[in-house]
Amino acid sequence: MVDLVIIGGGPAGLAAACKAWESGLRDILILERDKELGGILNQCIHNGFGLHRFGEQLTGPEYAGRFIDMLKNTGVKVQLDTMVLEVTPDKKVHCVSKTEGYQIIEAKSIVLGMGCRERTRGAIGTPGTRPAGVYTAGAAQRYVNMEGYMVGKRVLILGSGDIGLIMARRMTLEGAKVLACVEVMPYSGGLTRNIVQCLNDFNIPLYLSHTIVDIQGKERVEKAIVAEIGPDRKPIPGTEMEFDVDTILLSVGLIPENELTKQAGIEMDPRTKGAVVYENMKTSIP
């Protein structure tokens, strides 16, 4: 029996482990499916992290490193390269790893820190053919920042969330030509700071109330057709613009990683698709 099992070694899991240890808990186990702690922070090589927590500007890996260093001075146990398969309502965690094999870990308490995943092209129903060259912004970020692969040369970004804005800047700095950022809403979904630093500073146009109405290409993306959206949320005929691109990045929102949450029988919020939590962040299972 473990006092606290934390599923996920990203920013939420790391912060939870540090706070639990600080609060006096001594039997803590972090389960992380990747080969290192940090989660999404490891691919966020831009700065802007840590200002509130540490009083200075840090990159994502530096921010994660601060928490990892804090954990080194504790007795928190970490199990990497471990995939959690199931969480039962009676707080049994089923997981598997190369080193430990199949395990069933009983916990007094569980912190769910699985994070989220990106919406894909299929989730938003973008019409057109299905050529190579369409990526989520996060996948492109990992390829460029961690794997060392350039995903394209002429880029159009759909969605103006922060990760899309940041990737507009990153792709430009890596030598690509970002033709535009297209946003279906009449306002941007990202921070004003990111619009200024990632779009305006690089003369990348932002088209509000616009969306992609067609993707063309056989083996690889060749063109993207963009049109203005009317008050009825439908494309306005005659407003189409044609962009010659070989890459489209999607920054169209995030979805909670909630499969384990559902398995545990936790009450779900149909609006957010995540767990219903109370003021102390407890779920419906005490």
How would you name each of these model-derived features?
Residues M1-P286:
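Residues forming the flavin
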